[in-house]
Regions:
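Substrate-binding/catalytic cleft of secreted carbohydrate-active enzymes
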Residues: 1-139, 144
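Surface beta-strand/loop "capping" patches
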Residues: 139-157
Length: 157
């Protein structure tokens, strides 16, 4: 709290236009006016976002994480995107993650290049496929969820 607050004061004194984002200001309202230039949360439901935006918001609202693409998800993206047209103070959100975290290795059996994630090397403890939650694979090939993102983002060009 105190260090982030000091950083925000520093940037304000420099008057260089930098904005400060700190998600935990939602959980500690003592810093709400000094620690973040945004109202921000992770994974708030669309109705929770609207509750803030309908009650005289003091700051723009950003979802610092709002879609987690584990498996083949993104099904709720449209509910959040509708808020963009409805509220000037809603500035969207950030998808977690854009890209899978994996490394390319040569498979010892087939000799082919394959992507490997946590746990594929008998490493323990491991996050296993939890690092495979992007909208593109680690080799930059698109996952099916990218179709949903492309559709909704395309409406706002």
């Amino acid at each position: 709290g105190d260090d982030i607050e000091a950083m925000n004061v520093y940037f304000a004194e420099k008057k260089d236009g930098r904005l400060v984002h700190y998600e935990s200001s939602y959980y500690n309202r003592a810093y709400e006016d000094t620690i973040s230039d945004f109202e921000t949360r992770m994974y708030a439901k669309p109705e929770d976002v609207e509750e803030y935006l309908n009650n005289s918001p003091k700051k723009p609202y950003i979802l610092c994480e709002f879609m987690h693409d584990m498996g083949n998800s993104m099904g709720g993206l449209g509910s959040y995107m509708k808020l963009i047209d409805k509220y000037d103070m809603y500035h969207g959100g950030f998808i977690w993650d854009f890209i899978d975290q994996a490394i390319m290795v040569k498979d010892s059996v087939t000799g082919k290049d394959v992507l490997r994630y946590g746990g594929d090397f008998d490493d323990k403890p491991s996050d296993y496929e939890f690092s495979a939650n992007g909208i593109v694979f680690a080799d930059r090939k698109e996952k099916p969820a990218m179709q949903e993102v492309r559709y909704y983002y395309g409406l706002y060009r």
